[in-house]
């Protein structure tokens, strides 16, 4: 990750990224993306719980997600581009946003087309927000690697409500490019700068934008008029940022369970050592492992004949798995050549206790990460009361509901950004009505059969109508549901009449 201080030197002001937050983002990246243990101990084996937690919450949050924009030709144009973001393949990037605390969907113009890029927390530096929390200034980084060089393009976007909002560094840049200050407000000043470096995490030396053919037609400075916030979809995780409570940036969704994840990894390391330390072995004097007086390696046939194992299994210098079957002990045992000595090492494993302990550690992780029991632990191993089960599911429901609300807010921001860019793309439809609808899966806390049973009871009590029941569970509109209920009632009435006739006839 490029140091925030280097970005601040270029734009002439502080970003919202502090030293503490940058270290945290890099730490989250190492844990969730690179799979390194949170305790930084190379001897610790990791269960990859940060990645697992992020992937599972991303799946539950976007499960059956439907977002549509309708109502006009402009709405259809926006909806087509929005659906590209919502494809299952694209949803995977939401996992990265959960892992690093935030992410931004940013439309960009490429000729007569409009693309949408995603920047995770290592690829953008927020500078300022307005009172409603919308981003008003930020720096985005686009990196291209070729051979041993890294080419970085910085896109600095700043909302200006009046000329006085221009800082000294910005005025100096305008003079460097011999450009006048903007005359229409509000507007967004967009500055593009190119750099070349030998490493991915440093800016390197300034270059012209023409150094890359992809950037050759990009203007160094441009103005986007009529916009009071950056045209982006800005997602921030809705959890307490325990790393820096005063920061506007989000935290990784697994950060509240950091200590518990470390405990679980340590317990998993103990369990692995229990299995490795308990591997079958045979202890014997080293001289009985020497294949000959000259120390020459036995042939495969000799080894199989004398020991019943391949020659590598009696090499006491290779201590792994099958190759550690024989242990050479260099001690004076007093054993003669005619009386071989060996002792089988086959201890009883204590994995049951370790597994029980590990499962409890995993439950602690679930509790602190806002998950329900059984997402990563084994629920069958622990007896729980009905109240514990309900409370656990409610915790997950609250976590996912908060994430869905934050994601919906970001997607609405993206829709507004697409609506803004439609005014600047040749051939895009003119202004029109935008009917935005979101549909989320709400069956996390209550399974389908339980919910149906509850509704059926409410229908029998007269609290709901049969038409409401069909509309909710069968997806019918009110007219279709009402007609279906009437048809069923008529059929039931006809059946009653027929039964009465048959009963009278029998009498």
What are these regions (language model features)?
Residues 204-391:
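Extended, charged amphipathic alpha-helical segments
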Residues 74, 81-90, 97, 256, ...:
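Short amphipathic alpha-helical segments
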Residues 4, 71-75, 87-91, 254-257, ...:
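Alpha-helix initiation and N-capping motif
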Residues 303-341, 345, 349-507:
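C-terminal helix-loop subdomains that flank or include functional centers
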Residues 99, 104-251:
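Extended, regular secondary-structure scaffolds
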Residues 13-16, 29, 45, 58-62, ...:
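Conserved aromatic-histidine-acidic binding/catalytic patches
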Residues 32-36, 75, 163-182, 292-315:
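Flexible coil/linker segments and helix-coil junctions enriched in charged and small residues
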Residues 1-151, 163-166, 301, 379, ...:
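Extended, helix-rich architectural segments
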């Amino acid at each position: 990750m490029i140091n925030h201080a280097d970005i601040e030197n270029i734009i002439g002001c502080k970003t919202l990224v502090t030293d503490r937050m940058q270290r945290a983002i890099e730490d989250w990246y190492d844990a969730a993306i690179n799979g390194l243990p949170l305790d930084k101990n190379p001897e610790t084996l990791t269960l990859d719980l940060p990645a697992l937690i992020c992937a599972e919450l991303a799946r539950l949050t976007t499960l059956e997600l439907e977002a549509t924009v309708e109502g006009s030709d402009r709405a259809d144009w926006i909806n087509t581009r929005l659906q590209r973001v919502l494809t299952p393949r694209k949803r995977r990037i939401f996992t990265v946003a959960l892992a690093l605390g935030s992410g931004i969907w940013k439309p960009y113009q490429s000729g007569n087309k409009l693309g949408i890029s995603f920047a995770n927390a290592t690829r953008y530096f927020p500078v300022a927000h307005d009172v409603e929390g919308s981003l008003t200034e930020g720096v985005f980084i686009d990196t291209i690697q070729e051979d041993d060089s890294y080419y970085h393009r910085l896109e600095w976007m700043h909302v200006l409500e009046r000329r006085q909002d221009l800082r000294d560094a910005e005025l100096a840049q305008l003079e460097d490019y011999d450009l006048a200050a903007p005359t229409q407000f509000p507007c967004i000043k967009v500055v593009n700068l190119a750099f070349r470096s030998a490493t991915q995490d440093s800016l390197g030396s300034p270059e012209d934008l023409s150094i890359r053919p992809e950037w050759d037609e990009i203007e160094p400075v441009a103005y986007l008029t009529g916009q009071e916030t950056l045209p982006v979809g800005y997602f921030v995780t809705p959890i307490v940022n325990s790393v820096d409570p005063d920061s506007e940036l989000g935290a990784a969704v697994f950060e509240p369970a950091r200590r518990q994840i470390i405990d679980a990894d340590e317990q998993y390391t103990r369990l692995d050592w229990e299995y490795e330390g308990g591997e079958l072995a045979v202890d014997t004097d080293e001289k009985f492992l020497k294949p000959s007086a000259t120390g020459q390696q036995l042939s495969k046939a000799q080894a199989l004949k004398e020991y019943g194992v391949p020659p590598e299994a009696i090499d006491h210098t290779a201590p792994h798995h099958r190759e550690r079957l024989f242990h050479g002990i260099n001690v004076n045992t007093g054993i003669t050549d005619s009386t071989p000595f060996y002792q089988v090492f086959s201890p009883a494993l204590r994995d049951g206790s370790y597994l029980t302990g590990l499962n409890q550690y995993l439950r602690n992780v679930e509790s602190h990460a806002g998950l329900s029991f059984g997402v990563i632990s084994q629920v069958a191993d622990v007896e729980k009361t009905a109240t514990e089960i309900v409370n656990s599911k409610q915790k997950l429901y609250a976590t996912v509901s908060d994430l869905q609300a934050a994601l919906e807010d970001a997607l609405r921001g993206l829709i507004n950004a697409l609506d803004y860019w439609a005014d600047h793309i040749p051939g895009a439809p003119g202004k029109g009505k935008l009917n935005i609808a979101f549909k989320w899966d709400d069956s996390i806390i209550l399974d389908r059969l339980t919910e149906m049973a509850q509704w059926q009871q409410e229908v029998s009590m007269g609290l709901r109508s049969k038409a409401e029941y069909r509309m909710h569970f069968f997806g019918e509109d009110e007219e279709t549901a009402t007609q279906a209920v009437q048809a069923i009632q008529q059929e039931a009435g006809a059946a009653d009449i027929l039964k009465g006739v048959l009963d009278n006839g029998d009498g």
